[in-house]
Amino acid sequence: MNPSAPSYPMASLYVGDLHPDVTEAMLYEKFSPAGPILSIRVCRDMITRRSLGYAYVNFQQPADAERALDTMNFDVIKGKPVRIMWSQRDPSLRKSGVGNIFIKNLDKSIDNKALYDTFSAFGNILSCKVVCDENGSKGYGFVHFETQEAAERAIEKMNGMLLNDRKVFVGRFKSRKEREAELGARAKEFTNVYIKNFGEDMDDERLKELFGKFGPALSVKVMTDESGKSKGFGFVSFERHEDAQKAVDEMNGKELNGKQIYVGRAQKKVERQTELKRKFEQMKQDRITRYQGVNLYVKNLDDGIDDERLRKEFSPFGTITSAKVMMEGGRSKGFGFVCFSSPEEATKAVTEMNGRIVATKPLYVALAQRKEERQAHLTNQYMQRMASVRAVPNPVINPYQPAPPSGYFMAAIPQTQNRAAYYPPSQIAQLRPSPRWTAQGARPHPFQNMPGAIRPAAPRPPFSTMRPASSQVPRVMSTQRVANTSTQTMGPRPAAAATAATPAVRTVPQYKYAAGVRNPQQHLNAQPQVTMQQPAVHVQGQEPLTASMLASAPPQEQKQMLGERLFPLIQAMHPSLAGKITGMLLEIDNSELLHMLESPESLRSKVDEAVAVLQAHQAKEAAQKAVNSATGVPTV
């Protein structure tokens, strides 16, 4: 092939049939001996970041790309032979059908390489593929030649020839639209009739007797099993279309031996599957449309609520077509569905019932979503949050991000340039005014109004509004734990004692976990212009969080209370991701978060969804880094 041919100025190769684990680095190692490479890209799913099984390799010189195509096609990478062809960026060239031929009735042993070797004698091949499924070859394939003349030579010489003792059909490639048009035309002039549901006592002679009155038949066959017993269906092939049509019109739906038989046009398996698929998709779409905006998802149900009670609670808002509490082993799973007759009734029910306490629990009520919609919504939410975090130029503390390795999480407060980059939460509360409180009112302490919390006895340290000499105040954490600490209440410390307890050198904070609650004690080494010290706060323990306790707390404290209880549970499942997952879950409605605290299964389900989103994002970043490290240039 001429390397300077105008067909391939980009020197770009398509590499298909890749193993799912093949990466850009592996392809670079494989193809770099052929010549300098500009870039490599393995195409991946946008959500899961899994490989789609093909990649593009861009060489600097067309001659190098041609060398790779000639010498490496069908080479094995991770146990799978790869299929290489020129990259056709113009889809019209691929879809026009010029130079493309179709081969069927192939032996199972013929693979891509054998097909390529067989047809390469007729001209340059752009692509060659045997169609396969999980069981191997499906018995047909395609060969795309560079010119139409080569394709016509292959059809002329190979059609009807034997390949591995099987007579193959070789013909011009036809698009699906062309095939469907031909099939539709043939369907109107059918002569083959399919009959079913006539029982086991039917044979060929009797079937011929039944249908012979409509016209001469070329063949009659009742399908039987290994023992010769009828399978209950058969075929009659007439000479003329008019006779076949008359048989269908008169015999379809008639009773035979007490059974209603079906008589219709015989269809190929692919045609029948296509029609059934179309009907199924239509039914699915109709069902989605019918329940759009009227089906409600109800969560956090009391164990004593059954279908009748659920219907009774929602019946004041309109006509209910169905109400179902999901059960497992005879016990309620804590959620169910209520379907109304109109979207207006469903909207009213959501407005009135969401958050209402029924029996002993507050309900979570929302429009029901399919699993795909929920996952897409969660992924979209996460991507938006990540984009907003990247858009902030200054250091940002992630929502409830643990300060490694202590596990203490901090509120998300963006820093300004005139302030130290990292502060403990209580000092941020002092320094940063919040629009949710008036200038005269002080912002509550993070642990204020929490059961079992003891407020610091020492007064708040003064601070300076002057810009510090350094743009950052370093944050020093430690994994040490305070040993042999009893559950005693801290009282005021004299100034002298406080001075004596603070050494001149930098100190390391120590932590104690009491009854599932973090007890941070931090010392901040500030610059000379900022003099601050975080008093120790000792939390004796936490009472179980109830709906009434949550409702009585100020709105700004509710997420804090929920986060304090969610974080240890999530940390037990995923220690390294606990901070990020907690921040993601805190965007959910409070009543649903309360249900998660009471239901480990519900919490684990939501945590698993969040982990899937995080892993997808991390895989995307890892793939990007792998490309940059392998090629040293940006991906195309």
Swiss-Prot record:
One of its GO terms (molecular function) is mRNA binding. Residues 166-289 are annotated as: UNR-binding. PROSITE patterns: PABC (PS51309), RRM (PS50102). SUPFAM superfamilies: PABC (PABP) domain, RNA-binding domain, RBD. The modification Phosphoserine is found at residue 315. It comes from the Eukaryota. The modification N6-methyllysine is found at residue 299. It is found in: Cytoplasm; Cytoplasm, Stress granule; Nucleus; Cell projection, Lamellipodium. The modification Dimethylated arginine is found at residue 493. Coiled coil: none annotated. Residues 542-619 form the PABC domain. Phosphorylated by MAPKAPK2. Keywords: Acetylation, Cell projection, Cytoplasm, Methylation, mRNA processing, mRNA splicing, Nonsense-mediated mRNA decay, Nucleus, Phosphoprotein, Repeat, RNA-binding, Spliceosome. The modification Phosphothreonine is found at residue 319. One of its GO terms (cellular component) is protein-containing complex. The modification N-acetylmethionine is found at residue 1. InterPro entries: Nucleotide-bd_a/b_plait_sf, PABP-dom, PABP_1234, PABP_HYD_C, PABP_RRM1, RBD_domain_sf, RRM2_I_PABPs, RRM_dom. The modification Omega-N-methylarginine is found at residues 385, 419, 432, 436, 475, 481, 493, 506, 518. One of its GO terms (biological process) is CRD-mediated mRNA stabilization. The modification Asymmetric dimethylarginine is found at residue 493. PANTHER family: RNA BINDING PROTEIN. Binds the poly(A) tail of mRNA, including that of its own transcript, and regulates processes of mRNA metabolism such as pre-mRNA splicing and mRNA stability. Its function in translational initiation regulation can either be enhanced by PAIP1 or repressed by PAIP2. Can probably bind to cytoplasmic RNA sequences other than poly(A) in vivo. Binds to N6-methyladenosine (m6A)-containing mRNAs and contributes to MYC stability by binding to m6A-containing MYC mRNAs. Involved in translationally coupled mRNA turnover. This is Polyadenylate-binding protein 1. It comes from Rattus norvegicus. The lineage of its organism: Eukaryota, Metazoa, Chordata, Craniata, Vertebrata.
